[in-house]
Regions:
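Alpha-helix capping/helix-boundary segments
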Residues: 14-15, 49, 91, 111, ...
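Short, well-structured N-terminal submotif of metal-dependent ribonuclease cores
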Residues: 1-48, 60-69, 73
Length: 152
């Protein structure tokens, strides 16, 4: 009998915690990644995550938080992770609707739209996003609160 992994959407702020060691919630983000690698958790994201990942690495390079070699390694590592990327076309309309309704960026809303469409929780490492919308969206979760056994 095969075990079906639980599914969640992650945003780029969660994924970038796998690279940086100086951010809040890195232990839980690391556990989330371990659960994914070990097959207990299926990670989903809009394909936008790849661009935000690259932009986050670029910003870290400019701020001298990471070295060039670390950025290259991290850029390559993203494609090795078992993240189910969803194309823009799957969520474009719902993304615009959620951005308008919640007055959030189209980028942030893409992750929310995918989670709503899939009917799964969305984990974020962005405290401002979480604080602004967690009361309205009961499926939006702060990565620092991640525990596999708490997922529906």
């Amino acid at each position: 009998m095969s075990v079906v992994a639980k599914a969640i959407v992650i945003d780029a702020s969660v994924a970038l915690k796998w690279v940086f060691s100086d951010e809040e919630g890195i232990e839980q983000a690391a556990q989330l990644l371990i659960d994914s690698v070990e097959g207990r958790l299926a990670l989903h994201a809009p394909d936008l995550l790849g661009y935000e990942w690259g932009n986050g690495l670029w910003a870290a390079l400019r701020q001298q938080r990471i070295l060039w070699e670390e950025a290259l390694t991290a850029m390559s590592a993203l494609s090795l992770l078992n993240i189910h990327f969803h194309p823009f076309s799957e969520v474009k309309d719902l993304t615009l609707e959620l951005a308008h309704r919640h007055q959030r960026s189209y980028y942030d809303s893409a992750y929310l739209a995918l989670a709503q469409q899939l009917g799964v929780w969305c984990f974020t490492g962005d405290k401002r996003l979480y604080n602004a919308l967690s009361q309205q969206l009961d499926w939006l979760r702060w990565v620092g609160d991640y525990r596999l056994d708490s997922l529906p």
